[in-house]
Design a protein with these regions (language model features):
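Solvent-exposed loop/turn segments at secondary-structure junctions
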Residues: 188-190, 208, 231-232, 266-270, ...
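Conserved catalytic neighborhood of penicillin-recognizing serine enzymes
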Residues: 207-235, 290-293, 360-364, 478-539, ...
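Beta-strand segments within the central parallel beta-sheet cores of soluble alpha/beta enzyme folds
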Residues: 261, 265, 346-348, 483-490, ...
Length: 775
C-alpha cells in the first residue's frame, strides 16, 4: 500500500510536466498513426488479397520434330539447339544441354506443353548421316523412338506497360534447397519474426559501424517484398517507416507460405534492356536456359546471391564478382547444414554455367511477328496478350528463318552496287501444309520498319505465267504440254486508244511452239496468245479465287501486270506446291494458357484438291524451267538433285526481280527491287533466283519427285497439233499428259515413216531449246 501511495504521489507531481507530451502522443496515435495504419492496412489487403502479377505472353517457334529420314544437317541441328537456348556442356545430362560425339548428338530436352499436347523432358540420341536423321533413340534404354520433339525456341514476348519478365510458380514446386538457402542467406529467422527482425537490425547496425560502411542488411524477406510491391527506391525515414509498418501488417494477415510464394515470384533478379527479370523461375531461364526445378545447387546459390545486387553481381558482366558471391552463399549453405562441406567444396569448383544467349527475346523476327499478330488479334485483345501469361506456338522454323536472312544478305553483297541499292523480301512455307516457316521483310535482319514481305505490292512479271498455263491445262481435252501456241508478234488497242505491242525479253519470236517451251523459256508472246485464246476473264477469275482484288482484266495481266506482295505471291504458288489444295497461309498453331491447356487451336481445313492433273503438269513443266529454262542455274549451282520446280519473274525495265520455287518440303518466294521503284538492274534469274539458291544450299529439305504425278502418263506428242505421236516422228516430244485424254492411235506418223524410206524425211525429234532466256 505504501508503494502504491508513493507511486500515486509521484504521478501527481509529474503530471503537470508530462501532461502536454502525453496528450501530444495520444493525439498523434489517434489522429495520425491509427488512421494512417488503417490506410496502409487497406492498401496491403487490397493488393495481397488479389495478388496478380503481370506476366507477358511468350511467342515460340515450332517444336523441332526429329524422326528417322527427316532431312537434317549438323549445322542446322546445332543452330536449332543454340537458338532454343541449349548449351553444349560436354555431358548432355541436365535438361537444356547437349553433347556431340562424331555424328551423334545426346540431347537432354526440357519438355513443353503445346497445342499438340507437348512432350515430357527426356534424353535422346540423334544420329545424323547423308543429310538426314539416321536414327532417334532413348538415351537411357537405347530403344528406337518413332518421333521426338525438342521444345521450341522463344522468338518474341508481348510485354505490358511494366515490361516485366516473370513466370509464376507455386510454393510446392520450388526446390526445397532454394527455399532453405534463401532463408539461410537473407532471413534466418523468417519462420519466427513478425515482419521485422529487431535482432537482425541490431546485428547489422553493429557490423556496419565496425566496417565504416554498409556491409550487412537487416531487412527481412517480408520487408524486401514490401519494397518490391509497394515502395520506390528512395532512401528516407518515411519509406523506412512505411516498410516496417506494412511488413507487420502483412505478417498479421497472411501466413508465411503465402508471403514466401509472393517473394519467390516477385524478387528482382536482373535486367535486359527495358525488360526486368522478376522471380526465380524467370531468372532460371534467363541465366541458365532451363526451368527452376532443373537447377543445380550451385546455380541456386548464384541466384540467391544475386538478390543482394542483381546488377552488381550480374554474371554476364561481372563473372568474377558473381563467382565470389556464389561461393560465399555456398559457404552459408554448409554453415546452416543444407549441404555438406564436401558438397560445398565440389560445387565451388564448378564454373558459373551461364548461357550466353539469355532467353528474353522481345521481337527477334519482326516481319514474321507482324503476320502472327494479324492472325491472333481477332481472338485476343491487347490486354490479354500483354499480361495474360499465354504461350503462342507459331510455325516459325528457326533454321529456315536464319538461312533466308543469310541468303538475302549474301546475295545483296555479291551484287555490288546493284545489291546496295536494292531491297529484298522472302517468304518460306511448308509445301504440303501452308505453314509459314520464315518471313524476311528487309535485307537488314531484324529491321522493324517497312515489311516488304507483307506490305510491298509490286508487279510480279512472269511469275503469273504458270497460272495462265494451269488454266489452259485444266481443259485436257483441248490443251496439253505439247499443244502448239503462237510465239508471234501481236498488237492490241488499249482502252485509252494507244497500241500495246508486247515483246519477248530478247526481242525475237519463235513462231509456233509447244506449250512446254513457252513456259520453260518464259516467252511473253506465246503466253499472251495462249491467254487470249483462253480468255483474259477466265484468268482474272482464277486469280481472284485466291483472294486477290483489283485484278486488271487487260491482256497485260497475262505477263504479270499485277501488283502483289511476296506473301500474296506465295499464296498463289502454295496452291501448286500443295498439289492443287488451296491452303491458307498460317503462322500460328495454337495458344496455351498458364496451366498448359490449349485455349485456341488454328487448324487448316483442307478439302479435295482442284485441277490436280493440271497442277501436276505445271509442276513438271516448272521442273524443266529449273533444268533447261530461265532457272537452269539451279542445276549448275549443285542443287540439281532437288528436282525443284520454279519460275522466275521480272517486271518492266527490270524494276522487280522475283523467283518462286519449291522442293518436296519447302516453297520459297524471293523478291528484290528498289524502294523508289527505279530499275534495279536485276532479272529474276540474276537476283532473286540467286538468293533462293543460297537458301537451299543450307536448308535441309527433301527433293521433289522427278516422276510425273498420279493421274499422268508419259506420251509421245506431235508438237504441231498436240496429238499422240510415236518415238522418232518429226516434232515428237515425250511429255506427261493427263491419262486417258489422248487417242491411243498415233496420227500421221505412218506416212512420215513412208517418206523416210524414200529418203524424204530424216528429221530427228525436235528437242526443247536449251538456251535459257534471262527472265
Amino acid at each position: 500500500m505504501a508503494f502504491l501511495t508513493r507511486l500515486r504521489s509521484f504521478a501527481a507531481a509529474a503530471w503537470p510536466w508530462v501532461r502536454i507530451p502525453f496528450w501530444i502522443c495520444m493525439g498523434l496515435l489517434f489522429g495520425f498513426v491509427l488512421p494512417y495504419t488503417m490506410v496502409l492496412n487497406k492498401r496491403v489487403q487490397d493488393r495481397f488479397n488479389d495478388l496478380v502479377f503481370a506476366v507477358p505472353t511468350r511467342i515460340y517457334a515450332r517444336p523441332l520434330p526429329l524422326a528417322a529420314s527427316t532431312p537434317m544437317t549438323p549445322a542446322a541441328l546445332e543452330l536449332e539447339l543454340t537458338f532454343a537456348g541449349y548449351s553444349n556442356d560436354g555431358h548432355g545430362q541436365v535438361a537444356g544441354t547437349w553433347l556431340k560425339d562424331g555424328s551423334t548428338y545426346t540431347i537432354a530436352s526440357r519438355g513443353y506443353a503445346g497445342p499438340d499436347g507437348g512432350e515430357l523432358p527426356k534424353r535422346i540420341r540423334v544420329a545424323l548421316g547423308k543429310g538426314q536423321v539416321a536414327s532417334v533413340k532413348d538415351a537411357a534404354s537405347g530403344k528406337p523412338l518413332e518421333l521426338a520433339h525438342l521444345d521450341p525456341a522463344r522468338i518474341a514476348t508481348l510485354y505490358g506497360a511494366q515490361q516485366e519478365e516473370r513466370r509464376i510458380v507455386r510454393l510446392p514446386d520450388v526446390p526445397p534447397l532454394l527455399l532453405g538457402g534463401l532463408q539461410a542467406v537473407e532471413d534466418r529467422d523468417f519462420k519466427h519474426h513478425f515482419g521485422i527482425d529487431l535482432t537482425a537490425i541490431l546485428r547489422a547496425s553493429f557490423a556496419n559501424l565496425r566496417a565504416g560502411h554498409t556491409v550487412q542488411g537487416g531487412s527481412t524477406l517480408t520487408q524486401q517484398l514490401v519494397r518490391n510491391l509497394f515502395l520506390d527506391r528512395e532512401q528516407n525515414f518515411s519509406r523506412k517507416f512505411n516498410e516496417a509498418l506494412m511488413s507487420i501488417l502483412i505478417e498479421a494477415h497472411y501466413d508465411k507460405s503465402r508471403i514466401l510464394e509472393a517473394y519467390v515470384n516477385e524478387v528482382f533478379l536482373g535486367q535486359q534492356g527495358s525488360q526486368a527479370v522478376h522471380g526465380f523461375a524467370a531468372a532460371s531461364e534467363f541465366y541458365f536456359g532451363r526451368r527452376m526445378e532443373d537447377l543445380k545447387p550451385q546455380e541456386m546459390a548464384l541466384l540467391i546471391g544475386m538478390v543482394k545486387g542483381p546488377s552488381y553481381y550480374d554474371p554476364r558482366r561481372y563473372p568474377d564478382r558473381a563467382l565470389s558471391r556464389r561461393n560465399l552463399v555456398l559457404d552459408q549453405f554448409v554453415e546452416t547444414g543444407l549441404i555438406s562441406a564436401d558438397q560445398g567444396a565440389a560445387y565451388k569448383a564448378t564454373p558459373l554455367g551461364i548461357v550466353t544467349n539469355g532467353q528474353l527475346p522481345h521481337n527477334r523476327f519482326p516481319a514474321f511477328m507482324q503476320l502472327v499478330r494479324a492472325q491472333i488479334t481477332s481472338d485476343f485483345d491487347d490486354e490479354t496478350l500483354s499480361n495474360g501469361n499465354l504461350s503462342v506456338f507459331t510455325t516459325l522454323d528457326p533454321a529456315a528463318q536464319l538461312y533466308a536472312e543469310q541468303a538475302i544478305t549474301t546475295t545483296a553483297n555479291s551484287l555490288g552496287k546493284r545489291g546496295e541499292a536494292a531491297q529484298a523480301a522472302a517468304v518460306v512455307t511448308e509445301a504440303q501444309t501452308g505453314a509459314v516457316l520464315a518471313i524476311v521483310g528487309s535485307k537488314e535482319p531484324g529491321d522493324q520498319g517497312f515489311n516488304r514481305a507483307l506490305d510491298a505490292r509490286r508487279p510480279i512479271g512472269s511469275l503469273v505465267k504458270p497460272l495462265v498455263y494451269l488454266v489452259a491445262l485444266a481443259n485436257p481435252q483441248r490443251w496439253n504440254l505439247g499443244s502448239p501456241v503462237e510465239d508471234s508478234p501481236i498488237s492490241m488497242r488499249q482502252p485509252d486508244g494507244t497500241m500495246w505491242t508486247p515483246k519477248n525479253d530478247e526481242g525475237d519470236s519463235h513462231g509456233e511452239v509447244p506449250m512446254i517451251d513457252g513456259l520453260v523459256h518464259s516467252w511473253n508472246l506465246a503466253t499472251i496468245n495462249l491467254g487470249m485464246n483462253i480468255g483474259v476473264a477466265r484468268i482474272k477469275s482464277f486469280l481472284e479465287s485466291f483472294g486477290l482484288t483489283d485484278v486488271n482484266p487487260s491482256p497485260s495481266l497475262l505477263i504479270g501486270a499485277l501488283d502483289m506482295s511476296p506473301l500474296q505471291a506465295t499464296q498463289l504458288y502454295q496452291y501448286i506446291a500443295a498439289d492443287g489444295h488451296a491452303l491458307p497461309l498460317v503462322a500460328v498453331r495454337g495458344v496455351v494458357d498458364e496451366k498448359g491447356q490449349t485455349i485456341k487451336r488454328y487448324q487448316v481445313k483442307t478439302g479435295p484438291g482442284e485441277y490436280q492433273p493440271a497442277v501436276r503438269l505445271v509442276t513438271w513443266a516448272m521442273q524443266q524451267v529449273a533444268r533447261t529454262g530461265t532457272a537452269a542455274s539451279i542445276g549448275s549451282s549443285g542443287l540439281a538433285y532437288l528436282n525443284a520446280a520454279g519460275k522466275t519473274g521480272t517486271s518492266n525495265d527490270m524494276r522487280d526481280s522475283w523467283f518462286a520455287g519449291f522442293t518436296g518440303d519447302h516453297l520459297a518466294v524471293f523478291w528484290m527491287g528498289r524502294d523508289d521503284n527505279k530499275p534495279s538492274g536485276l532479272y529474276g534469274a540474276t537476283g532473286s533466283l540467286r538468293a533462293w539458291q543460297e537458301l537451299f544450299r543450307k536448308l535441309p529439305t527433301r527433293p521433289l519427285s522427278a516422276a510425273p504425278g498420279d493421274g499422268l502418263e508419259m506420251a509421245w506428242i506431235n508438237t504441231s497439233d498436240g496429238k499422240r505421236s510415236e518415238e522418232g516422228c518429226e516434232g515428237a516430244r515425250q511429255l506427261p499428259v493427263v491419262a486417258g485424254t489422248l487417242s491411243q492411235d498415233a496420227e500421221g506418223c505412218f506416212w512420215q515413216h513412208v517418206g523416210n524410206l524414200f529418203g524424204g524425211g530424216e528429221q530427228t525429234p525436235a528437242p526443247a531449246s536449251t538456251a535459257p532466256t534471262r527472265d
